[in-house]
């Protein structure tokens, strides 16, 4: 239990940040799933379009330090390779 005003405020901020970060992580996972689904469907044009949107989401989440920049690069690289393999 937070005893000081500062500790209570930090606890409140932590809860709000957790909600926000969870939302961003969920958005990231959804974007990646959409790309994987279009790859599984075999539609290269649609996959490329969805990948472009997912790249934006991945970069945004990495910029906010929700995931590490190397993890973001790894996601983008693997998705791009999978799209390229559709040819």
From Swiss-Prot:
> GO CC terms on record?
cytosol; small ribosomal subunit
Q: Where is this region: Disordered?
A: 1-24
Looking up InterPro entries in the UniProt record yields: Ribosomal_bS20, Ribosomal_bS20_sf
The record's Gene Ontology biological-process terms are: translation
Q: Which Pfam families match?
A: Ribosomal_S20p
What keywords tag this UniProt record?
Answer: Ribonucleoprotein, Ribosomal protein, RNA-binding, rRNA-binding
What molecular function terms (GO) are annotated for this protein? small ribosomal subunit rRNA binding; structural constituent of ribosome
Provide the family line. Answer: Belongs to the bacterial ribosomal protein bS20 family.
Function of the protein: Binds directly to 16S ribosomal RNA.
> By what name is this protein known?
Small ribosomal subunit protein bS20
Tell me the organism's taxonomic lineage. Answer: Bacteria, Pseudomonadati, Pseudomonadota, Betaproteobacteria, Burkholderiales
- Tell me the name of the encoding gene: rpsT
